[in-house]
Amino acid sequence: LSKKGLKKDYKIFNQDSKVTVLNDKEIDFDKNIVTQICDKLYHDKILSVIIEGGNKTLSNFINSNMWDEIRIFKTQEILRDGIKGPNIKLKAKRKIEIENNILEYYSNNGVTFSSI
């Protein structure tokens, strides 16, 4: 999901798998983007999706209760670039330490993390 579009030389376009990019040609950003995205996914018979969006996209999915699982990496390092993620006001179901970082798992609708 991108208002500006993505450069064609990004690695996601390396032909290893199907990639769907939604931009302002497919999505009206002045309307409910979650409904529009879900309608597009349903039309394309896509049953599972990973949303790696910016704060606005992620917050819209969380606030619409249209999510099953959230994974958040937390670090003590100061990250100077990037976009701040949404503020999750839930208790993590599981936390795993990976080197000097913490991976937090949140679930909705009874999803479990037994495979981790």
Give each language-model segment a name:
Residues L1-I116:
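Enzymes that bind and transform nitrogen-containing heteroaromatic metabolites
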